[in-house]
């Protein structure tokens, strides 16, 4: 797939997101000269310790998008079992097709060209509400999520306030 085809697809997805985007999510190209890097703002889901937080993130698309998945990285301090310490999100929908060596994911959960930016961002919001501690990216967050949920929620709420400058 050519970079021009990827660009057309990204422009179409951006138009759909601006016209019909889900609540709690804003996303679009970082600048009009580069449609392959998007700035996102994800609102913490209600009823979770992330509630009230506004989380900036960056989506980076490969030149063969949608054949290859993008990467998503939070650009603020973030504590979650499925987010690496550098902010990179680790969820099935962002994993390239193929076999999962750890046997945690079925191929139907992984990236395919029918996925979209909207589906990715909705999956991230779902991940915030329901972490997968079986295939953790942040071992400390996994351990705290399993063993001391109250402390985990306290840490996440503190970081949520920090996203608001409080």
Swiss-Prot record:
Tell me how the protein is altered or processed after translation: Autoubiquitinated at Cys-90; undergoes 'Lys-48'-linked polyubiquitination, which leads to proteasome-dependent protein degradation.
Cross-referenced SMART domains: UBCc (SM00212)
Which chemical reaction does it catalyze? Answer: S-ubiquitinyl-[E1 ubiquitin-activating enzyme]-L-cysteine + [E2 ubiquitin-conjugating enzyme]-L-cysteine = [E1 ubiquitin-activating enzyme]-L-cysteine + S-ubiquitinyl-[E2 ubiquitin-conjugating enzyme]-L-cysteine
The highest taxon in the source lineage is Eukaryota
- To which pathway does this protein belong? Protein modification; protein ubiquitination
Report the GO terms under cellular component.
cytosol; endoplasmic reticulum; nucleus; ubiquitin ligase complex
What UniProt keywords apply to this chain's record, in alphabetical order? ATP-binding, Nucleotide-binding, Thioester bond, Transferase, Ubl conjugation, Ubl conjugation pathway
Entry EC no(s): 2.3.2.23
Instruction: Show where the UBC core domain sits.
Output: 5-165
This molecule's function is given as:
Catalyzes the covalent attachment of ubiquitin to other proteins. Functions in degradation of misfolded or regulated proteins localized in the endoplasmic reticulum (ER) lumen or membrane via the ubiquitin-proteasome system.
Entry's InterPro entries? Ub_conjugating_enzyme (IPR050113), UBQ-conjugat_E2_core (IPR000608), UBQ-conjugating_AS (IPR023313), UBQ-conjugating_enzyme/RWD (IPR016135)
UniProt similarity note: Belongs to the ubiquitin-conjugating enzyme family.
Q: Which GO terms describe its molecular function?
A: ATP binding; ubiquitin conjugating enzyme activity
GO terms in the biological process aspect are: ERAD pathway; inner nuclear membrane-associated protein degradation pathway; protein polyubiquitination; ubiquitin-dependent protein catabolic process
Name of the featured protein: Ubiquitin-conjugating enzyme E2-18 kDa
Where along the chain is the active site annotated? Answer: 90
Q: Which organism is it from?
A: Schizosaccharomyces pombe (strain 972 / ATCC 24843)
């Amino acid at each position: 797939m050519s970079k021009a085809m990827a660009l057309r697809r990204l422009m179409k997805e951006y138009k759909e997101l601006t016209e019909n985007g889900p609540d709690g999510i804003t996303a679009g190209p970082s600048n009009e000269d580069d449609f392959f890097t998007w700035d996102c703002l994800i609102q913490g889901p209600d009823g979770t310790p992330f509630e009230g937080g506004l989380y900036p993130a960056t989506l980076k698309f490969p030149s063969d998008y949608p054949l290859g998945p993008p990467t998503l990285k939070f650009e603020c301090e973030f504590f979650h079992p499925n987010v690496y310490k550098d902010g990179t999100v680790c969820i099935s929908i962002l994993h390239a097709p193929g076999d999962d060596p750890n046997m945690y994911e079925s191929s139907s959960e992984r990236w395919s060209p029918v996925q979209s930016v909207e589906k990715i961002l909705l999956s991230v919001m779902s991940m915030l509400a329901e972490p997968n501690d079986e295939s953790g990216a942040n071992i400390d967050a996994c351990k705290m999520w399993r063993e001391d949920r109250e402390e985990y929620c306290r840490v996440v709420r503190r970081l949520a306030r920090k996203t608001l400058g409080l």
